[in-house]
UniProtKB/Swiss-Prot annotation:
GO terms for biological process: proton motive force-driven mitochondrial ATP synthesis. F-type ATPases have 2 components, CF(1) - the catalytic core - and CF(0) - the membrane proton channel. CF(1) has five subunits: alpha(3), beta(3), gamma(1), delta(1), epsilon(1). CF(0) has four main subunits: a(1), b(1), b'(1) and c(9-12). It comes from Prototheca wickerhamii. Its main location: plastid. This is ATP synthase subunit beta, plastid. It comes from the Eukaryota. It is a peripheral membrane protein.
Length: 481
């Protein structure tokens, strides 16, 4: 963040309560709400202090209450605080690709500072209604299970549910890779209140898979913005807005389709709850901030399609105590167009991506949006898999031979479908030894229709495992023994 200090407008710290600072200004010119304030001083050991905070409340008597974006270690009453005269601004544009930033837009990857000639404020209005693109269109990902059973909306918001070790990171990286290759777009990853280790692992894996191009950093496909778990609540509350601002530039100025990943959207609301309590607001239900819905709405309404481009957002959602009625996830669900649920059961079978075909949903899966053929195919696939699920208890007790011929046929086709929903990923080529596959929606529908019709009953289920389109499964030629 570039700091422009208005030297005439400064105040002094009068109270420090953790990350909350009360600052009294002497002149008549008071900072406005959301203005960035900077503290440049030395601590008791003579080390430099540089802290940025954001005005949250105007208390009267020339006093403001601000929330710090940095740790407040070393601060003391009486220190001078400067009003920068504007809200937080962060660098945007191609110079952000391949780099890691913090909430202030400062690079934290030890590769030197980024170009700050292009900057935008993190607090911006949502696009005007007249600028929105209201046309319903599918955002093709090239991943069979997603495109067929829970398609993403262009400019929509998708909730990604999954525990540790079920392939969430690999799915995120494949989506970043596919949007770059197919749509010519870029991605922005916002790590909100995540573990530092996970953020580091993601960065290293992106470098290994080529999503971040170390040789030519500007040719990378993703920008990373991190506000880790150990950061003050102010930083965790604003890091999502920093990532969103970078994505908005690619949509509005570069006219691109952008993928915005937020991991984890619950941590954004949790940080808001901490800040609200520190500011002395009365809590709402379950201790959350009274402004829960408006904070979420302000973020989500900026994630949309315009006539220039789109931001399609994939948000990891943590469910506290597995309680879907908790105000944080319940507020999030109201904004989602689709849910992608990752299943540990499928991951244990080696079926990747481990997307649960029966639990994942999408508002786009309607015949007047996706077309009659796509809709019928998806419903038939779900019915077959649902029937297979119902029969599994009987199979476990009595065995497959005790089923009727019709049910045995359903089980055989369901097992083929389950395996055909798997797919080799480009970003996992190093681990699987298989070349990655991008499958168009038309090829996906054709393949599942052939399985459902019985035309491929002669092939063994192994022919459908980790393949791209149906021609590849047929060419494998594993006939039943």
């Amino acid at each position: 963040m570039t700091v422009f200090i208005e030297t005439q407008n400064f105040g002094t710290i009068t109270r420090i309560i953790g990350p909350v600072l009360d600052i009294t200004f002497t002149g008549n010119k008071m900072p406005k709400i959301y203005h960035a304030l900077s503290i440049i001083d030395k601590n008791s050991e003579g080390l430099d202090i540089f802290i940025v905070c954001e005005v949250q409340q105007l208390l009267g008597d020339h006093c403001v209450r601000a929330i710090s974006m940095n740790a407040t270690d070393g601060l003391k009453r009486g220190m001078t605080v400067f009003d920068t005269g504007d809200v937080l601004k962060v660098p945007v544009g191609r110079s952000t690709l391949g780099r890691i930033f913090n909430v202030l837009g400062e690079t934290i990857d030890n590769l030197g500072p980024a170009d700050t000639s292009n900057q935008l404020p993190i607090h911006r209005s949502a696009p005007k209604f007249i600028d929105l693109d209201t046309k319903l269109s599918i955002f093709e990902t090239g991943i069979k299970v997603v495109d067929l059973l829970a398609p993403y909306r262009r400019g929509g918001k998708i909730g990604l549910f999954g525990g540790a070790g079920v392939g969430k990171t690999v799915l995120i990286m494949e989506l970043i890779n596919n949007i770059a290759k197919t749509h010519g777009g870029v991605s922005v990853f916002g790590g909100v209140g995540e573990r530092t280790r996970e953020g580091n692992d993601l960065y290293m894996e992106m470098k290994e898979s080529g999503i971040i191009n170390e040789a030519l950093i500007s040719e990378s496909k993703v920008a990373l913005v991190y506000g880790q778990m150990n950061e003050p609540p102010g930083a965790r509350m604003r890091v999502g807005l920093t990532a969103l601002t970078m994505a908005e530039y690619f949509r509005d100025v570069s006219s691109q389709d952008v993928l915005l990943f937020i991991d984890n959207i619950f941590r954004f609301l949790q940080a808001g709850s901490e800040v609200s309590a520190l500011l002395g607001r009365l809590p709402s239900a379950v201790g959350y901030q009274p402004t829960l819905a408006s904070e979420m709405g302000a973020l989500q309404e900026r994630i949309t399609s315009t006539k220039d481009g789109s931001i399609t957002s994939i948000q990891a959602v943590y469910i506290p105590a597995d309680d879907l009625t908790d105000p944080a996830p319940a507020t999030t669900f109201a904004h989602l167009d689709a849910t992608t649920v990752l299943s540990r059961g499928l991951a244990s079978k080696g079926i990747y991506p481990a997307v649960d075909p029966l639990e994942s949903t999408s508002t786009m899966l309607q015949p007047w949006i996706v077309g009659e053929e796509h809709y019928k195919c998806s419903q038939n696939v779900k019915q077959t898999l649902q029937r297979y699920k119902e029969l599994q208890d009987i199979i476990a007790i009595l065995g497959l031979d005790e089923l009727s011929p019709d049910d045995r046929l359903i089980v055989a086709r369901a097992r083929k479908i389950e395996r055909f929903l798997s797919q080799p990923f480009f970003v996992a080529e190093l681990f699987t030894g298989l070349p990655g596959k991008y499958v168009s929606l038309a090829k996906t529908i054709q393949g599942f229709n052939l399985i459902l019709s019985g035309d491929l009953d002669a092939l063994s289920e192994q022919a459908f495992y980790l393949v791209g389109d149906i021609e590849e499964a047929i060419s494998k030629g594993f006939l039943k023994k």
